[in-house]
């Protein structure tokens, strides 16, 4: 299974939605809580090509985008192949 990473903040409904979808699919993921900012927030912005919103999701270092992007991949039937590696 590929490496899945998600940058999130506390009390973020979009973050909850994205994590719920991944959890329902049985996907383990590394979560980085950037609620307080810090170096991980700067890292996220760099990796996400300037995006500052959360969540920001990466699958095997490929930038997927946010919760809506993840949901769109799921609706299009493209998420499972990405998660299969």
Regions found by a protein language model. Give the residues of each.
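Residues that form or flank phosphate/diphosphate-binding pockets in enzymes
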Residues: 16, 39, 65
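Local sequence-structure signature of Cys/Sec-based thiol-disulfide redox active-site neighborhoods
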Residues: 1-32
């Amino acid at each position: 299974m590929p490496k899945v990473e998600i940058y999130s903040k506390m009390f973020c409904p979009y973050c909850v939605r994205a994590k719920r979808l991944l959890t329902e699919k049985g996907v383990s993921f590394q979560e980085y809580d950037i609620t307080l900012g810090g170096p991980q927030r700067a890292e996220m912005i760099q990796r996400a090509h300037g995006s500052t919103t959360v969540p920001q999701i990466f699958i095997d270092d490929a930038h997927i985008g946010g919760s809506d992007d993840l949901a769109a991949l799921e609706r299009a039937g493209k998420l499972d192949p990405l998660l299969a590696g």
